[in-house]
Amino acid sequence: MKKEIKRDDVNVIEKDFGNNNSIILKLFKKFGEDSFFIQTTVTDIIVLWIDGSLLLALAKFLLTINNPYNMLFDLYGIDERMRLYKHNLPLSHFSVVYHFISINRNSDIILKIALLEEKLSLPTLTKLYPNANWYEREIWDMFGISFENHPNLIRILMPKTWVGHPLRKDHPARATEFDPYVLNKYKEDIEMEALKFKPEEWGMKKNKQSKYMFLNLGPNHPSAHGAFRIILQLDGEEIVDCVPDIGYHHRGAEKMGERQTWHNYIPYTDRVEYLGGCINEMPYVLAVERLAGIEVSQRIEVIRIMLSELFRINSHLLFISTFIQDVGAMTPVFLAFTDRQKIYDLIELITGSRMHPAWFRIGGLAHDLPKGWNALLKEFLLWMPKRLLKYINVALKNSILISRSKGIAEYNKHDALLWGVTGAGLRATGINFDVRKKRPYSGYQNFDFEVPIGAGISDCYSRVMLKLEEIWQSLAILKQCLENMPEGPFKMDHPNTTPPHKVRTLQHIETMISHFLKVSWGPVLSSNESFKMVEATKGINSYYLISDGNTMSYRTRIRTPSFPHLQQIPSVIRGNLISDLIAYLGSIDFVMSDVDR
């Protein structure tokens, strides 16, 4: 395969990839330089195109080297057929992207495989990385790319009766592009039949000595935390096996990114994980700013952090209180909603909205901080510590809660990495990986805070207690924001993001023309690929954006933490009781919009 950077130009490799160049040299030595095409992007990640025949050998190599790339962070497809600016990339109609992370190295590597329409097929990675299962099903569902020897390659987000593959460029993006939908008795029977669970399709076989029951938990069960179904194979109350069934909340968030301008997509980011608010806006605007070459002021960075930590506390309070409710105590829910109201009052004062502010902007913020924000924040910082002690004393030290959650739904660091677990679930296993510390963004490196780490085993109780500790750390960050808010602009003076100053419009007609085009059409960003991850409320959230020199994204990939977390459920809960499953679901901290997108 053609190379963009030659092996003997080590200086170029070091300049582009810094400390990560060692893995490139190892790959060159093992597989030969001609096996790779190095793509230059603004992702700050090694991006290598390879032939599909090398995939299994390369993945095994990455998984078994010293300090291995033992997390398959993301896996997704791209329809390359309408892409204008390919920059001499390998010929492809579609491509499949594998994003690996080495926690020990704090390093990423992305492998891309070019596919032609005549052969849309690759070998499955499920035997090496078990979390590839759902990602490969999603690629089949969205693009029609198959994976050889996959254990059960069926749709995952779309209904079984759906026709077509939605993320292909020739698939309609709007409801008005379809024929009018009519639901008659015949169609209803077909849809209901498609929802029936058939155990034999999943390799679930009856034992002659045991009479198993198959039970639907959800998609409207209160302990399922949303439109989510788990099919349980039961021997009495013991869970022999289970199959999580998702997709009921799918709204096509990635497809929408292909139809909205760079600015207009911001409100959609809030709704991917509807409790995270501004945290969800952060990776998107940072990725777009990287594409546009925009650097923001320190004031913007600190305000973004302040809003993110307010939403983090807000989400954690809901998680902790509803977990306690799931195992049998009601009082903390009422305490939490009182505390969350105080946070929403502050968020509403600053942004004008509550749950979905859509307040971050490319290159800044919607507006500056209002008068009185600091007094309200100070009041909250005085209030919250006393309330946290109440949660601990009233519920989290309760012997019944501890017995219902400690030692329940356990997994270790090896399993967490192979299943793609991030956030508190990963840190509870003893792995110290918080993006705010390991890969600081928006100025987090200037703040003094600790990352709570578990003792080595992640169980229901440790996951909850880590989230509680994270609230204390978020309060410490907010205090620093209050005491050290820098001066400066709330929006950068950049033609792609900000209207020109009045004085310039009276002197230079070009500024008016530029303003008219940027407002009416949207900003045009140069062709490139960008990536940004953040430590969100439920784990690592990231955006991979492809610009094709247009006013909107060519491909918007949203990696959410809850998707792999739900995929892990069967491996953790087999052999446990139904009551343990309820506690486990409550300890994951997920919302279905984050899973289904």
UniProtKB/Swiss-Prot annotation:
Top-level taxon in the UniProt lineage: Bacteria
Lipid bilayer topology: Peripheral membrane protein
GO cellular component, one term: NADH dehydrogenase complex
UniProt region (NADH dehydrogenase I subunit D), positions on chain: 211-597
EC number from the UniProt entry: 7.1.1.-
Catalytic function, reaction form: a quinone + NADH + 5 H(+)(in) = a quinol + NAD(+) + 4 H(+)(out)
Enzyme class: translocase
A GO molecular-function descriptor: NAD binding
A family per Pfam: Complex1_30kDa
Swiss-Prot/TrEMBL keywords: Cell inner membrane, Cell membrane, Membrane, Multifunctional enzyme, NAD, Quinone, Translocase, Transport, Ubiquinone
Disulfide bonds: none
Subcellular location: Cell inner membrane
Annotated spans, NADH dehydrogenase I subunit C: 1-188
Keyword Membrane: yes
The keyword Transferase belongs to this UniProt entry's keyword annotation: no
Subunit structure comment from the entry: NDH-1 is composed of 13 different subunits. Subunits NuoB, CD, E, F, and G constitute the peripheral sector of the complex.
NCBIfam families xref list: NuoC_fam (TIGR01961), NuoD (TIGR01962), PRK06075.1 (NF004739), PRK11742.1 (NF008728)
Family: In the N-terminal section; belongs to the complex I 30 kDa subunit family. In the C-terminal section; belongs to the complex I 49 kDa subunit family.
HAMAP family: NDH1_NuoCD_1, NDH1_NuoD
Main function: NDH-1 shuttles electrons from NADH, via FMN and iron-sulfur (Fe-S) centers, to quinones in the respiratory chain. The immediate electron acceptor for the enzyme in this species is believed to be ubiquinone. Couples the redox reaction to proton translocation (for every two electrons transferred, four hydrogen ions are translocated across the cytoplasmic membrane), and thus conserves the redox energy in a proton gradient.
Name this protein carries in UniProt: NADH-quinone oxidoreductase subunit C/D
Source organism phylogeny: Bacteria, Pseudomonadati, Pseudomonadota, Gammaproteobacteria, Enterobacterales
